[in-house]
């Protein structure tokens, strides 16, 4: 009854209006699992390869027909009649079928779409929610949301060099209350920005993209909004940053074009340490460039005991890179992006490795998203305690928050909101 009878790939649009892959996996019992694949703007050099057509006459070269063809032909033939019960075997077949280290032949977008759709079809066939199917009976932790309310870097057309300024409602008693807190701060911030004469257009992830001169200026606005909304920064709400430092690391220096400043590796580490000392910042993602290994070690030694240091471009959800980071004392947390590695099995392996090493894990969206809410279920399935899925605007972001609300309601008394315990530096 759980045998795969059809796999249907198609080209759809993501939240930026670019093509992406969607996959339906149809089972013998009539169950259908559907998954849509996200896409990043600031991508790590070591990520699995997203296959694009490259035909400039169609979608400016960003079409994904080659990936769709691979799904409908080669991948379908390899998986047809298989049972979806064995996710590990399915993912191993997909990896071997591709035959490359970075999934560049079939495309990580094709492989991931099929991998996730198989898991969803299996969950439907067993009449189980996805978080329960993947995580078992222990899956009950609702994550603290990292809400990206000010956008900069490649996510926005403004002078701010850091990519994301986020709030984390760690003091809320439930996920629903955390979401309310974030929404109230988001709308208060909009009013404060308007009052100061800034535009309130939003970036790719739904956060505001004002013309502010520096990270300090952005943090000051966020701090003011937290207070005006009736919350206490450092108690009810903590701050988090995604520097996306790889994007402004040039010739061995961190070049802040918006501030007209350049910082050495040591100066970058000290600058971030100074921000942590002056603001209630509990998490910094990609504070150093993806290949600045000495910089990562210096930053971790400097503030790793009091701040979560998340490796995104550094680790790209890859167990080999994560293992190297753990062994050499770089970062203390990993960002989990399913499309960076390309299969559900490899994603879960990265989370497990992080846990065993005492690292935290943060489930994450990409800047190019869809209405697919799989990562909400995966955050609960893995009990990772943190999710990064954008602002309180744009339905591609709120789709994940709304799914978490449903899960919390469904779990009822079993639901546990991670709160401050999600961050080892605060626990």
UniProtKB/Swiss-Prot annotation:
PANTHER family: ENOLASE. The active site is at 205 (proton donor), 337 (proton acceptor). It comes from Bradyrhizobium sp. (strain ORS 278). (2R)-2-phosphoglycerate binds at residues 163, 337, 366-367, 388. Binds a second Mg(2+) ion via substrate during catalysis. GO terms for molecular function: magnesium ion binding; phosphopyruvate hydratase activity. Mg(2+) binds at residues 242, 285, 312. The gene is eno. GO terms for cellular component: cell surface; extracellular region; phosphopyruvate hydratase complex. It catalyses: (2R)-2-phosphoglycerate = phosphoenolpyruvate + H2O. Its cofactor is Mg(2+). Its EC number is 4.2.1.11. This is Enolase. Belongs to the enolase family. Pathway: Carbohydrate degradation; glycolysis; pyruvate from D-glyceraldehyde 3-phosphate: step 4/5. Catalyzes the reversible conversion of 2-phosphoglycerate (2-PG) into phosphoenolpyruvate (PEP). It is essential for the degradation of carbohydrates via glycolysis. Keywords: Cytoplasm, Glycolysis, Lyase, Magnesium, Metal-binding, Secreted.
């Amino acid at each position: 009854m759980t045998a795969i009878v059809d796999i249907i790939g198609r080209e759809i649009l993501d939240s930026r209006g670019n093509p992406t892959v969607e996959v339906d996996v149809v089972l013998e019992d009539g169950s259908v699992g559907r998954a849509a694949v996200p896409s990043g703007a600031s991508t790590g050099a070591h990520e699995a390869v997203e296959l694009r057509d490259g035909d400039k006459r169609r979608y400016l070269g960003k079409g994904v027909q080659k990936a769709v063809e691979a799904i409908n032909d080669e991948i379908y033939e390899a998986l047809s009649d298989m049972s979806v019960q064995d996710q590990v075997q399915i993912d191993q077949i997909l990896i071997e079928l591709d035959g490359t280290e970075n999934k560049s032949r079939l495309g990580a977008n094709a492989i991931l779409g099929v991998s996730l759709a198989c898991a969803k079809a299996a969950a439907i066939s067993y009449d189980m929610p996805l978080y329960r199917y993947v995580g078992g009976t222990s899956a009950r932790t609702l994550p603290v949301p990292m809400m990206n309310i000010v956008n900069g870097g490649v996510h926005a057309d403004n002078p701010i060099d850091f990519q994301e300024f986020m709030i984390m409602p760690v003091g809320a008693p439930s996920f629903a209350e955390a979401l309310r807190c974030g929404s109230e701060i988001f709308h208060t911030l909009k009013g404060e920005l308007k009052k100061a004469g800034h535009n309130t257009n939003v970036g790719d992830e739904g956060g505001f993209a004002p013309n502010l001169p520096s990270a300090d200026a952005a943090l000051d606005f966020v701090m003011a909004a937290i207070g005006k909304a009736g919350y206490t920064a450092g108690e009810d709400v903590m701050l988090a940053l995604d520097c996306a430092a790889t994007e402004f690391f040039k010739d061995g220096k961190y070049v802040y074009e918006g501030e007209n400043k350049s910082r050495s590796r040591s100066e970058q580490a000290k600058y971030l340490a100074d921000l942590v000392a002056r603001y209630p910042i509990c998490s910094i993602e990609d504070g150093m460039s993806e290949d600045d290994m000495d910089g990562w070690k210096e930053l971790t030694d400097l503030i790793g005991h009091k701040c979560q240091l998340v490796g995104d471009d550094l680790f790209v959800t890859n167990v080999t890179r994560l293992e190297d980071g753990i062994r050499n004392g770089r970062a203390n947390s990993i960002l989990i992006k399913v499309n960076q590695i390309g299969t559900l099995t490899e994603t879960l392996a990265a989370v497990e490795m992080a846990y065993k090493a005492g690292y935290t894990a943060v489930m994450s969206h990409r800047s190019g998203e869809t209405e697919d809410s799989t990562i909400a279920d995966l955050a609960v399935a893995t009990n990772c305690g943190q999710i990064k899925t954008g602002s309180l605007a744009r339905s591609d972001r709120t789709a994940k928050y709304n799914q978490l609300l449903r899960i919390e309601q469904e779990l009822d008394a079993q639901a546990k909101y991670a709160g401050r315990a999600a961050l080892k530096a605060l626990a």
